[in-house]
Amino acid sequence: MIDRQAILDVLRTIPDPEMPISIVDLGLIETVGVTSSADGNVVEVVALPTFVGCPALDMIRRDIESRVGEMPGVESVHVQWVNDPPWSVDRISEAGRESLREHGVTVPDTGNRLDVHQVSATVPITVGATAIPCPFCGSMDTQLDSPFGPTRCRMIYYCDACRNTFEHLKKV
């Protein structure tokens, strides 16, 4: 039987196509299961999309199937995308947060996220103009430049101190 940790180690080598972070550190992997068969091992990966309709899902699925499928003893790989539990920035590992910071992307603090299982009505989510520390110089002299970034999960901030723009992940 193939080791679950070995599969996770392979999954750690797969980068998210839109951010400088592995899919494991981004918190996309919910579960990994292995079933033995006469022909080899069948690997089941359950993953969470950051957003419904994320255009990178097919690419990530192909990368998982390809990389894990190359492991000795693996007969087949099945990837299933689920929306429950919903992905949130709280799932990003500390190593992932550091990698994002090094590449100029900040991440909201963990906790205080909306629990969708306890909400019975539509709840408006506003994008606040709270100052975010600049990942380049550390200054708090920053401002929201645009709530719309290069992907649906990011927004653009501007640092008045070092005059750099940077991305910040939305708290979902």
Regions found by a protein language model. Give the residues of each.
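Short linker/helix segments within small regulatory modules
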Residues: 146-156
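Short edge beta-strands and adjacent turn/loop segments
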Residues: 18-48
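Short functional micro-motifs and their immediate structural scaffolds
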Residues: 139-143, 167
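N-proximal, solvent-exposed amphipathic alpha-helical segments enriched in charged/polar residues
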Residues: 1-26
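Residues immediately within or flanking Cys/His clusters that coordinate Zn2+
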Residues: 131, 139, 156
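Short cysteine-rich clusters marking metal-coordination/redox-active sites
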Residues: 134-137, 159-162
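Short, non-transmembrane amphipathic alpha-helical segments
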Residues: 50-76
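Short metal-binding segments enriched for Cys and/or His
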Residues: 161-172
